[in-house]
Amino acid sequence: MRLESNKWTAWLLAIVIAIVLPARALADAPKEIRMGYPGVGVGNRPAAAGNAVATMHLRGMLEDEFKKDGIAIRWSFLRGAGPAVNELYANNLLDFSLLGDLPSIVGRASGLHTRLLAGQSVRGNIYVSVPADSPVRSVADLRGKRVAVAKGTATHLAAGKILEQFGLTEKDVRLINMENNVATAAIVTGDIDAAFGGSNWLGLRDQGVSRVIFRTTGGDPKFTSNSTFIGNEEFIKRYPEITQRVVKTVLLAARWLAEQESKPEPVYQLWTRTGFTYASYKEDWTNESMKYKTSPLIDPYLYARYEFQITEAKRLGLIRQTFDFKEWVEPRFLEAALRELQLEKLWLPRDESGQPKG
């Protein structure tokens, strides 16, 4: 009888565990994952391009990953770019985001509790555009001119260094804080004399309403921008398993980009959902390695790029104090995802100079 009683007790215990544990796990999962992106497409479209996070959004990969769990994915594409993303983190309204180097550095230096989870892009090209009928032929000609840049963004940091290269500082121009879509309209109407931005200026040039007077393609990478995938430290600590799945999905998007290395046309076509042109993406990425530039690895090159940018941001007065980059990095989720997906050999780690090891 006692043996039979013990069997019933074990059976009932098994039923309780089977019911209670999944319910407890479900109760501990978030109802939604709040994703942020520093920018919008043409006409404020909620879409972006150029990296794995943007590609993951366009392909609906994160939604597919969490659909079976009933966890919603809420994306915020912000006209205010990097500073607007930091504002959401400051108010605990965001869980993960792509973020350019300067705004993420500013956020960390000012005390935001974020962690860097994966690389996203290096050597992002910067362009300087002027109206088509402008007499300006060089960045050196911008002294005293009305120059637009989205302040607090990765482009802003690059702009400061590009101006220096031509003997100028921000004080030598009339620097106007202006997001991309507004700057595009202002170039067309002649309300500004020049603007710093990305490959979107190539499409405007092709329409015959602007000229590109400077571009970083093929030049010194110190004038280019970088971005990473970061997360809210509170969310990461509370939901490590969810964080692991998010990072794994980012990695899957990066793998898809790497697989298009030899024939990137499907990537450019996908990215046109932003409203920017296929031709502008193709030109911007000509002679560039998509696999190299969108590597998710947190390797010595990413360390070197960000340590340099932290120093430059301090030198140019964009942050008041620096911080230890190593303490910001949280590589365990990326490393676990690389092992799980057996992708340890897909991307070669790059040394401090940017050369692939091996």
Model-found features: residue ranges?
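Short, polar/charged alpha-helical segment
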Residues: 41-72, 109-110, 162, 305-308
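A ligand-binding cleft/hinge motif common to bilobed small-molecule-binding domains
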Residues: 98-110, 160, 165, 192-212, ...
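Secondary-structure end/capping motifs
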Residues: 43, 238-322
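Flexible hinge/capping segments at coil-to-helix
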Residues: 131-146, 237-240
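Short, well-ordered beta-strand elements
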Residues: 29-54, 71-77, 144-148, 174-176
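Pocket-lining segment of extracytoplasmic ligand-binding domains
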Residues: 176, 182-274
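Short helix-initiation/N-cap motifs at beta->coil->alpha
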Residues: 75-87, 100, 168, 173-188
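Conserved C-terminal helix/tail region of periplasmic/extracytoplasmic solute-binding proteins
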Residues: 311-358
